[in-house]
From Swiss-Prot:
<keyword id="KW-0520">NAD</keyword>
<dbReference type="InterPro" id="IPR010089">
    <property type="entry name" value="Flavoprotein_WrbA-like"/>
</dbReference>
<dbReference type="InterPro" id="IPR005025">
    <property type="entry name" value="FMN_Rdtase-like_dom"/>
</dbReference>
<keyword id="KW-0560">Oxidoreductase</keyword>
<feature type="binding site">
    <location>
        <begin position="114"/>
        <end position="120"/>
    </location>
    <ligand>
        <name>FMN</name>
    </ligand>
</feature>
<feature type="binding site">
    <location>
        <position position="12"/>
    </location>
    <ligand>
        <name>NAD(+)</name>
    </ligand>
</feature>
<dbReference type="GO" id="GO:0010181">
    <property type="term" value="F:FMN binding"/>
</dbReference>
<feature type="binding site">
    <location>
        <position position="99"/>
    </location>
    <ligand>
        <name>substrate</name>
    </ligand>
</feature>
<feature type="binding site">
    <location>
        <begin position="79"/>
        <end position="81"/>
    </location>
    <ligand>
        <name>FMN</name>
    </ligand>
</feature>
<protein>
    <recommendedName>
        <fullName>NAD(P)H dehydrogenase (quinone)</fullName>
        <ecNumber>1.6.5.2</ecNumber>
    </recommendedName>
</protein>
<dbReference type="InterPro" id="IPR029039">
    <property type="entry name" value="Flavoprotein-like_sf"/>
</dbReference>
<feature type="binding site">
    <location>
        <position position="135"/>
    </location>
    <ligand>
        <name>FMN</name>
    </ligand>
</feature>
<comment type="similarity">
    <text>Belongs to the WrbA family.</text>
</comment>
<dbReference type="InterPro" id="IPR008254">
    <property type="entry name" value="Flavodoxin/NO_synth"/>
</dbReference>
<keyword id="KW-0285">Flavoprotein</keyword>
<dbReference type="GO" id="GO:0050661">
    <property type="term" value="F:NADP binding"/>
</dbReference>
<keyword id="KW-0288">FMN</keyword>
């Protein structure tokens, strides 16, 4: 049984929604156990509520020590100036002990993201995230162009060969589109299929 973790940080629910569809795609693959978790919030609770952060997310909070228990980890983050969110960075900065042991070497790592605008740094967020995963010795998996949603030209949409993305809009009012969610499910399924092959 291959084990897949979908691990995310979401401020306003966009990445949370994408994570749920990533997990749905992974669960569609036979022989896969899927876990959905989030990283801890670093903003004090009163401040988080004051700025509208979604604090009532159902997914349990992950710990660094559990990461080696999975064959594949699909990470999700909103964009912060072309990079991952500080909450995800803080979590990953605690994985030095895992790096010392080589505990994540050979495991699949994949990334999805959310940006405020079409040109808000979705691709650089994912590719810069890859640097950390490569230092951990993980095997990077993106979204191949076999996923038809990547070539959808009928609308403004997220989605890259590096990983699924969604465009939240400058005010956060736009929710993930059907095309973006299709790409998310594809990514989850694709990673899960590869995890089964690697685990066998």
């Amino acid at each position: 049984m291959a084990k897949v973790l979908v691990l995310y940080y979401s401020s306003y629910g966009h990445v949370e929604t994408m994570a749920q569809h990533i997990a749905e795609g992974a669960k569609s693959v036979p022989g896969v156990e899927v876990t959905l978790k989030r990283v801890p919030e670093t903003i004090p609770a009163d401040q988080a509520k004051a700025i509208g952060v979604k604090v009532d997310q159902a997914a349990p909070v992950a710990t660094v020590d559990e990461l080696p228990n999975y064959d594949a980890i699909i990470f999700g983050t909103p964009t912060r100036f072309g990079n991952m969110a500080g909450q995800m960075r803080t979590f990953l900065d605690q994985t030095g002990g895992l790096w010392m042991k080589g505990a994540l070497v050979g495991k699949i790592g994949s990334v999805f993201a959310s940006t405020g605008t079409q040109h808000g740094g979705q691709e650089t967020t994912i590719t810069s995230f890859h640097t950390t995963l490569l230092h951990q010795g993980m095997v990077i998996v993106g979204v191949p162009y076999a996923c038809s949603g990547l070539v959808n030209m009928s609308e403004i949409t997220g989605g890259t060969p590096y990983g699924a993305t969604t465009l939240a809009g400058a005010d956060g009012s736009r929710q993930p589109s059907a095309n973006e969610l299709d790409i998310a499910r594809y990514q989850g399924k694709h990673v899960a299929e590869l995890a089964v092959k690697l685990a066998s």
